[in-house]
């Protein structure tokens, strides 16, 4: 490659979305260490000599093809690999990747599909390819890895030289000015925008609120929902039917972080939009559900109308050689099994300048047409090159634009603010998805609001926002743009997020979640019977029917309030089906020692799973844990002198499972640690004690739930005994901590141990009775429809139910000014 511009100083205000942080120089980007979860593949593999790895790999793959008379890299007569281009220089590839109707169905793979009569065979000698083959789960993926590696090794995959069509010697960077006054006057021919929303997850209400904020009748909205997010897809289909200028892609891909599939999604969306002749759009803007506007639609339209010939992309702001190295552009990647596998080195094609930065951009129609439909050497070969690239959307459009005839239209600004906090966001949190160490921006909080009020630079969107983490900042921004909702508007401080919906099927739930949801239903019905029932009346007594219908997380003022379980029941008085919703709230389990110690740094302690080091919270809201889970202990600290504390984990019968010391530095805010406990954990209420100089400071409790379901079926006695008796000999670790029991006044009661042993054999109603109680409270119950219980409230009239009014996220008719908000 060559660069057409001198090296630039690193910009301190760079807000690019790419994963090449300025302070991330010394991280090993490889991902070849064994994974933490148990796998069939042997973790010591990476340490063995390369030749032995190859032998084992050959045996493994060969065993699967046994009887087919094929070598490791061969295929049986009926096993056809996905079609793929024969060679990078083939100009027909651009046609293959171009014109398709937007009604096309598509899979979720990111790499272009290959067609080859003969599978290339070669000696797979690269350690990265061997590692990928060893870790890939499906046979199809292993074949793709082998095929791609061999084609690359034979020089059939990557373009060596690419034509540059930009007439400029260096990189163009048009300056654009932000004039607060000028944008108040709408031009006579305002631009119309195609908003492409690429969304995933389950935060449908946050998506609807964002959509409400960006909607205008003059623009167009094309929505792609990740093919793994079926609940969100159902919600999007439902609200999109209300508006003629909203369409949902009929094809769906699995747009994994860093994957080639995201670029495929953008390119296919562009082709679709260009073929919609009834949508005369001028600009393409990509957004996610974690974005929010920070200026109004009128301001955005006035600005883009003034610069309608420009393309807005944010560059990395550092020299190209370093960018290529840190972004792994000189490495070959392949996406399959919803993972990006690193397969080895490659060369950057000669003849062009490689650029990159943020994968959030605003592109004009003329350039989108060029990228989508051109079959010239640059576009064709860049599509091939970036089909095997990590984070391709962070570089493909930059590189094509900078080397194309449109190069003089580039503005080095993507008109966004991104909330980077490198210390928190660069925790290699995507290593389970990508063979690479990546970064991600943080969620905005109320203390960041001043950043949206700056008027010097043209910025129109910000990210990231997550209502499940902090909704207050979204409310502040929404009011800043569009004014406050009327006084007394319900639901403004509430947030609901679905975690289960009946069409998902119970197979989508873990046995722990299914167990707990059924327990919550029983607790709710017990509450209804005790608080609503009158003597001699059965009208408020119910019998549960089937599995939960839906489950929501409920937050109020950014505090988790518990689960809302919608479920079907039979009313015992009239023998008719009704549908109720039960609100379950966790009890407070953190307790400061009494009398309090003079150690004042500890503010809070919690145990859970799915610790998010970036946002510093447990994503397993409510801490639903079962015997086979691996809990993490978290502590939150105030500032103070360096200290060492002792953490002790105690099981339900006072067996000390683990003890360890933590050094708390003076500036530490959070610590977390997952002790390597032998499984299964004994069901019941556990205690985690925190001591300073062996003086108790505080303790927190957590429930390990015994499972009433195994593989979604009622658990059998032999399964219950195996899962609910604790680890063999009650040994959670090789080392015994029994000598600490007298020191901590933790006495092991033989009767208690015997009762725990009996509990382990429980199934059916006995098991259910053991489970309920303790750590959760049924706060309220309501009916979603008609009910024979005269004192049962209707869910839509409560403040807490997922059926209660939520005007901030509800989508209605278009207002006279063309907006929804």
UniProtKB/Swiss-Prot annotation:
PTM note: Contains 7 disulfide bonds.
Catalytic activity: UDP-alpha-D-xylose + L-seryl-[protein] = 3-O-(beta-D-xylosyl)-L-seryl-[protein] + UDP + H(+)
Recorded metabolic or biological pathway in which this protein acts: Glycan metabolism; chondroitin sulfate biosynthesis; Glycan metabolism; heparan sulfate biosynthesis
Subunit structure: Monomer.
EC number: 2.4.2.26
UniProt key word Disulfide bond: yes
Keyword Signal: no
Annotated protein name in UniProt: Xylosyltransferase 1
Matching InterPro entries: Glyco_trans_14 (IPR003406), XYLT (IPR043538), XylT_C (IPR024448)
Family according to the record: Belongs to the glycosyltransferase 14 family. XylT subfamily.
Basic and acidic residues composition-biased segments: 9-25, 41-58, 76-87
UniProt binding sites for UDP-alpha-D-xylose: 198, 226, 255-257, 359-360, 440, 463-464
Topology class, membrane: Single-pass type II membrane protein
Region (Disordered): 1-121, 801-821
GO biological process, one term: chondroitin sulfate proteoglycan biosynthetic process
Species of provenance: Rattus norvegicus
Transmembrane parts of this sequence: none
Source taxonomy: Eukaryota, Metazoa, Chordata, Craniata, Vertebrata
Topological domain spans for side Lumenal: 1-821
Positions annotated with a glycan in the UniProt record: 90, 286, 642
Cofactor(s) listed: a divalent metal cation
MF (Gene Ontology): metal ion binding; protein xylosyltransferase activity
């Amino acid at each position: 490659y060559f660069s057409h511009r001198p090296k630039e100083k690193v910009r301190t205000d760079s807000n690019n979305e790419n994963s090449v942080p300025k302070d991330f120089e010394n991280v090993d980007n490889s991902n070849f260490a064994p994974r933490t979860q148990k796998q069939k593949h042997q973790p010591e593999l990476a340490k063995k000599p390369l030749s032995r790895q190859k032998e084992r790999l050959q045996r493994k793959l060969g065993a699967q093809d046994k009887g087919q008379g094929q070598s490791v890299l061969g295929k049986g007569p009926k096993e056809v690999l996905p079609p793929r281009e024969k060679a990078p220089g083939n100009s027909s590839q651009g046609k293959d990747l171009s014109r398709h109707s937007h009604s096309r169905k598509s899979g979720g793979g990111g790499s272009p599909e290959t067609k080859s009569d003969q599978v290339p065979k070669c000696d797979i000698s690269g350690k990265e390819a061997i590692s990928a083959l060893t870790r890939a789960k499906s046979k199809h993926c292993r074949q793709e890895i082998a095929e791609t590696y061999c084609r690359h090794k034979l020089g059939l995959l990557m373009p060596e030289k690419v034509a540059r069509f930009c007439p400029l010697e260096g990189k163009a960077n048009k300056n654009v000015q932000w004039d607060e006054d000028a944008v108040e006057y709408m031009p006579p021919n305002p631009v119309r925008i195609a908003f492409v929303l690429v969304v995933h997850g389950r935060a449908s209400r946050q998506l609807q609120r964002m959509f409400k904020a960006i909607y205008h009748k003059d623009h167009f909205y094309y929505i792609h929902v990740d093919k793994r997010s079926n609940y969100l897809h159902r919600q999007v289909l439902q609200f999109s039917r209300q508006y003629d200028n909203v369409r949902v892609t009929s094809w769906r891909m699995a747009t994994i972080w860093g994957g080639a599939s995201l670029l495929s999604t953008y390119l296919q969306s562009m082709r679709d939009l260009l073929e919609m002749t009834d949508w005369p759009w001028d600009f393409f803007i990509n957004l996610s559900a974690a974005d929010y506007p920070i200026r109004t639609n009128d301001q955005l339209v006035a600005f883009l109308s003034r610069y309608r010939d420009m393309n807005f992309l944010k560059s990395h702001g550092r020299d190209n050689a370093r960018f290529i190295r840190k972004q792994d552009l000189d490495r070959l990647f392949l996406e399959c099994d919803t993972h990006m596998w690193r397969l080895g080195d490659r060369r950057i094609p000669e003849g062009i300048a490689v650029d990159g930065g943020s994968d959030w951009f605003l592109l004009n129609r003329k350039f989108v047409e060029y990228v989508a439909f051109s079959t010239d050497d640059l576009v064709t070969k860049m599509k091939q090159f970036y089909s095997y690239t990590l984070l391709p959307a962070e570089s493909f459009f930059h590189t094509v634009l900078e080397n194309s005839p449109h190069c003089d239209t580039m503005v080095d600004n993507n008109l966004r603010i991104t909330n980077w906090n490198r210390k928190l966001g660069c925790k290699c949190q995507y290593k389970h998805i990508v063979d690479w160490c990546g970064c991600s921006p943080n969620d905005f909080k109320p203390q960041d609001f001043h950043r949206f009020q700056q008027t010097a630079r043209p910025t129109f969107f910000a990210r990231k926002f997550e209502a499940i983490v902090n909704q207050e900042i979204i409310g502040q921004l929404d009011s800043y743009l569009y004014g406050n909702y009327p006084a007394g508007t319900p639901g403004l401080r509430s947030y609901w997020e679905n975690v289960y919906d009946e069409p998902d099927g119970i197979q989508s739930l873990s046995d722990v979640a299914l167990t707990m949801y059924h327990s919550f239903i029983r607790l709710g019905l017990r509450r209804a019977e005790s608080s609503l029932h009158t003597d001699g009346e059965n009208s408020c007594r119910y019998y549960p029917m089937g599995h939960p219908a839906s489950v929501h997380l409920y937050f109020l003022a950014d505090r988790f309030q518990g689960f809302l379980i919608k479920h079907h029941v039979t009313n015992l008085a009239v023998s008719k089906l009704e549908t109720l919703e039960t609100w379950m709230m966790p009890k407070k389990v953190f307790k400061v020692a009494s009398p309090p110690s003079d150690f004042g740094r500890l503010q809070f302690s919690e145990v859970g799973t799915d610790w998010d080091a970036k946002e510093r919270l447990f994503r397993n809201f409510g801490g639903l844990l079962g015997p086979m889970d691996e809990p993490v202990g978290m502590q939150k600290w105030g500032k103070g002198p360096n200290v060492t504390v002792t953490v002790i984990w105690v099981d339900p019968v006072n067996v000390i499972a683990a003890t360890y010391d933590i050094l708390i530095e003076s500036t530490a805010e959070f610590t977390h640690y997952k002790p390597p406990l032998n499984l299964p954990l004994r069901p019941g209420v556990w205690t985690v004690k925190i001591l300073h100089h062996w003086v108790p400071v505080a303790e927190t409790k957590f429930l390990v739930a015994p499972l009433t379901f195994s593989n979604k079926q009622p658990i059998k006695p032999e399964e219950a005994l195996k899962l609910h008796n604790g680890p063999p000999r009650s040994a959670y670790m090789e080392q015994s901590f029994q000598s600490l029991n007298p020191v901590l006044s933790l006495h092991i009661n033989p009767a208690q141990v015997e009762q725990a042993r009996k509990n382990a054999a429980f199934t059916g109603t006995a098991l259910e009775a053991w489970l309920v109680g303790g750590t959760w409270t049924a706060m309220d119950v309501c009916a979603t429809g008609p009910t024979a219980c005269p004192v049962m409230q209707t869910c839509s009239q409560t403040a807490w139910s997922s059926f209660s009014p939520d005007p901030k996220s509800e989508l209605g008719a278009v207002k006279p000014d063309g907006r929804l908000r």
